[in-house]
């Protein structure tokens, strides 16, 4: 009779241990499912953050841009179709410059329209390669006209990306950069009274990628006029450096040559000047 009592006691103990461990196991499972780190395992519903409506809006905007770009493409002579290719290396860029040099001179207005449309399209939909477009502007149009073209197109593309993100970008940014977005939101909240200076600093220096700034700015409630001014002015130093480098494509081996230690130091110096008034104002308040 003792044996059954022992078996019953062991079974009850095992059941008690199992019951006590269940909440912990459940919490751990929930923690894995709710892990928002970029490397964390996502549930099926989290793998693609956009809803059907948001994806439909994004696709519609993309289709409108693509259709407009294709219509501009059709205005070019058929002989030039095969020469059009978005450059991915300095070698591609040199070849594109040689192929389009005469066309850009003969049909300048048409070429500029196509160039601007392509640049804005790439900026709006976060397509890599705009730095090559900036180099191409310097190579084909010189420093002054190339600089104006690049700054205006980069600003227009960033603003277009801003509004697209405001429309459907919140879940995508939260999904891609959850920690970085929380950090950025906290920094913006601390600098509301001097937001333009802070945004200028971010635009001038490579502290945060421009892609992240374009997409996250409407999500952290940065006013559009602040975003526009910071983008227009803040992109000027880097644009000038890139456009000027386009005059000497033969001397460039890779894009990395554009931003050496000296260039980055100059950009950070200019960026520091942009936040100096805010630092001075804070010092006066403390005094």
Swiss-Prot record:
Bilayer-crossing regions: 55-75, 124-144, 147-167, 218-238, 260-280
Localisation: Membrane
Phosphoserine PTM sites in chain numbering: 37
Region Disordered, annotated ranges: 1-44
Topology in membrane: Multi-pass membrane protein
This protein's UniProt keywords: Membrane, Phosphoprotein, Transmembrane, Transmembrane helix
One cellular component term from this protein's GO annotations in UniProt: membrane
Pfam (any one): VTT_dom
Top-level division of the source organism's lineage: Eukaryota
Primary localisation category: membrane
PANTHER family: PROTEIN, PUTATIVE, EXPRESSED-RELATED (PTHR43220:SF3), PTHR43220
Name of the molecule in the record: Uncharacterized membrane protein At4g09580
Origin species: Arabidopsis thaliana (Mouse-ear cress)
